Amino acid sequence: MANILKTIIENDKGEIRRLEKMADKVFKYEDQMAALTDDQLKAKTVEFKERYQNGESLDSLLYEAFAVVREGAKRVLGLFPYKVQVMGGIVLHHGDVPEMRTGEGKTLTATMPVYLNALSGKGVHVVTVNEYLSERDATEMGELYSWLGLSVGINLATKSPMEKKEAYECDITYSTNSEIGFDYLRDNMVVRAENMVQRPLNYALVDEVDSILIDEARTPLIVSGANAVETSQLYHMADHYVKSLNKDDYIIDVQSKTIGLSDSGIDRAESYFKLENLYDIENVALTHFIDNALRANYIMLLDIDYVVSEEQEILIVDQFTGRTMEGRRYSDGLHQAIEAKEGVPIQDETKTSASITYQNLFRMYKKLSGMTGTGKTEEEEFREIYNIRVIPIPTNRPVQRIDHSDLLYASIESKFKAVVEDVKARYQKGQPVLVGTVAVETSDYISKKLVAAGVPHEVLNAKNHYREAQIIMNAGQRGAVTIATNMAGRGTDIKLGEGVRELGGLCVIGTERHESRRIDNQLRGRSGRQGDPGESQFYLSLEDDLMKRFGSERLKGIFERLNMSEEAIESRMLTRQVEAAQKRVEGNNYDTRKQVLQYDDVMREQREIIYTQRYDVITADRDLAPEIQSMIKRTLERVVDGHARAKQDEKLEAILNFAKYNLLPEDSITMEDLSGLSDKAIKEELFQRALKVYDSQVSKLRDEEAVKEFQKVLILRVVDNKWTDHIDALDQLRNAVGLRGYAQNNPVVEYQAEGFRMFNDMIGSIEFDVTRLMMKAQIHEQERPQAERHISTTATRNIAAHQASMPEDLDLSQIGRNELCPCGSGKKFKNCHGKRQ
């Protein structure tokens, strides 16, 4: 282990030496750039662009381009990047993460690689965690970029598609991670290419990269459509039942945060809902409602996991930032169960139309880099999942902050009593204090205690994050006391007021350890910026979540034996033990994220295939007849091959029914037309007849443009419907394969195999539906509407297909379970009308 650590440290030192040499080359251009007039300096941008177009690489332009930005920043912003900032910029250009401490000027560091990569004309995305930071950085740094001749855009959620498109067309685009993700998904749902807003993803520079790529890695971005099924009554019934339970009626696993009914709970459910057997297959839906009601009532906590807004809405609280996540909802019915629990209006369940995780969104960029003050603890994850290295950059001035050993108390009450006493003492001498909490509930509790102690203070949490920047900016003033949840105010520097340095600088107090060391380090890093003095102190209790999860029982005995109910234990060994517990949790979390990625990679591969083919259809300025005719041919082959083992007369009858109800006019084909033909000849005969019907359908359309429009909307409509159903099916499969792990099967392998089979079935189903709609649509000659922005075009109105129905005289007992259902759904018989047999 010691050798591994030594190797890592040596590698880092070697990297720093290499970066210092590269930074020196940038500095050699300093005098040359200083001698240029403003116009000459601005002209460098045009020169660099021409050199790039003529074959020079961005790497070869780096030294000169960085020197131009340094000089430009000095003239426009009054800031001159230090050597360590130039080093950080080089790391960013190479697609890695420079670990730079709080206050080291990450925003200015980013200007150099952003400028250099924008010269390619392919677009640079600067990604921030919230819109306030996007607007702030775009306004401040945009002044420099514009002066140097580059265009800057800001992409906000409130902007129209046209405004978004303009923002993405700029050389540099500032946006939040979620908005880039949603724009990507929406672009892959439009019917016309001109309605897409993004260009191909080129280079992303992610601010607070650990927050987005690690903490939110598992968060799927979901575009949903409402599901019409009215289920609010079931949510209320399940909630009423769950609230009637005693503690013995359910079992909670604290470590994994799971819950289930005990035998007595099952008996009560069967009595309450008047059932013979709760776990009968007919009650699968009901058990889902009960499971969600259990989680909502006994796992999800008000003011910790969520808050109830004044508008009677349930808002999720981000566990890492302490902010409410506007517009986000728990999926799979959990959000509705919480709404029932809190007695607020239940919103309709939604159906997923498109989804992607941040892991797969950001892996689609040609080059990805990011900035953070605390990335080294997650280096393995950055390297394995994103192929990014984390390189620690030295501080411009030595860090002077004093990090005290943790103080451990027996109870939460005695811990908070000590916190309030410490805050009061520091307030009285004028030293500013920042108190970091894990939950909204904790910050409210401490606030009440400080009010009682007569200590004026500000509270920054999910309930008032709109004042965030203002509160944080004042947190370093003499006598300021600020309570903040976790990461609130990240990205805004706390600058020390007059006379504060002499009092020891800003003191950061942590009220408990987070399960991630990185989050604790981020809290500590709010103090001691740019060589300022500062202090940090964590207060823990045996009743904290992290301590309960990892061995507080042994320590509890020590407190009881020594009769130390109000006193604290302080030791470096204790701090190391806590950090060891955190490492275990981090390891578990990493494993979970890695497994999520393995599952999501199945979806990613399938999504890329669908989106690529969809893009090809949208951008096609050609007749799509060859594609549609190929679909008709493959559908015919599937139907004929699907009945290959049936008796001859049964086979012919099934094929004839398919042809009548899905392919040809009903009275245009009889059994005699197919009798005596081989399977190959049947396929050819039906295909030739189908081509005539196709030509007849197309001839009803007014002109070539109308044909193209009809073909596009026909294909896109079918693909989007089937893809939406497929996403839901994959979600259900993922839940189901987890159970197969108990049968010694690898759930991921099972999911990959089953997901691949389902995808192939979906492709078959898409081709079946396109065939049926193309051949059976009632096409009317109509004028094309002028309003281009409406997706409801002539073509969508023209598709008024006959709903293929099951012939009344058909003997269903003769149809094989794995054959295609003759109703024309495109599903296998066992999954369609065969379910009723």
UniProtKB/Swiss-Prot annotation:
Enzyme class of the recorded protein, top EC level: translocase
Family of this protein: Belongs to the SecA family.
Chief place of localization: membrane
EC number, as in UniProt: 7.4.2.8
An annotated Gene Ontology molecular function: ATP binding
The keyword Signal belongs to this UniProt entry's keyword annotation: no
A GO CC term assigned to this protein in UniProt: plasma membrane
Protein name: Protein translocase subunit SecA
GO BP annotations, alphabetical order: intracellular protein transmembrane transport; protein import; protein targeting; protein transport by the Sec complex
Cystines in this chain: none
Cofactor(s) annotated in UniProt: Zn(2+)
Location of this chain's protein in the cell: Cell membrane; Cytoplasm
Gene3D superfamilies xrefs: Helical scaffold and wing domains of SecA, P-loop containing nucleotide triphosphate hydrolases, SecA, preprotein cross-linking domain
UniProt keyword annotations, A-Z: ATP-binding, Cell membrane, Cytoplasm, Membrane, Metal-binding, Nucleotide-binding, Protein transport, Translocase, Translocation, Transport, Zinc
Sequence positions that bind Zn(2+): C821, C823, C832, H833
